[in-house]
């Protein structure tokens, strides 16, 4: 129970090595880290509220396939979410996925095995801590060039991707 809470909230604490576990459990926990912490927390991942809105929007689209003229607002609690909020969550999800894929391809191109690269990028982008494979305890076997890519992933995960993307827009730097 402790491990699942620690990893899904991206706290990074472990009480035992994953090497002793059946392989599907650590992989399941790593995928849970994509959900991450709650909104407003410093936890990594997509955040629970964003995943919830993505789920509700997917459910709405399935209902629209059955009933094309259905007006189906997405609500969090009793509050109806504006379509712009939903679009911004999809934009964040797309940017998150893009950063993940670019970092994964970057680490693989540095000569890291695919399984280890996948786990290293998950651990860094989600600010997770533990991972699987050769990066389960430390990153000493990872080439320095891959560590630079993983550093970028870690910064993107910690500071939120949109916060970093804003720095690269010209309007941010105008007075």
Give residue spans per PLM region.
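Membrane-proximal intracellular helices of multi-pass ion channels
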Residues: 1-175
């Amino acid at each position: 129970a402790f491990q699942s809470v620690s990893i899904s909230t991206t706290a990074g604490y472990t009480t035992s090595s994953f090497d002793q576990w059946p392989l599907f459990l650590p992989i399941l926990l790593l995928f849970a880290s994509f959900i991450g912490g709650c909104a407003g927390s410093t936890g990594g991942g997509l955040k629970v509220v964003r995943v919830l809105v993505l789920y509700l929007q997917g459910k709405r689209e399935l209902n629209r396939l059955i009933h094309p003229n259905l007006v189906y607002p997405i609500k969090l609690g009793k509050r109806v979410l504006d379509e712009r909020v939903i679009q911004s969550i999809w934009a964040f999800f797309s940017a998150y996925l893009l950063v993940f894929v670019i970092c994964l391809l970057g680490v693989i191109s540095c000569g890291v095995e695919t399984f280890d690269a996948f786990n290293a990028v998950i651990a860094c982008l989600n600010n997770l801590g533990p991972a699987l494979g050769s990066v389960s305890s430390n990153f000493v076997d990872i080439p320095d060039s891959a560590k630079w890519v993983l550093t970028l992933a870690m910064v993107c995960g910690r500071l939120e991707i949109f916060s970093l993307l804003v720095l690269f827009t010209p309007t941010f730097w105008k007075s």
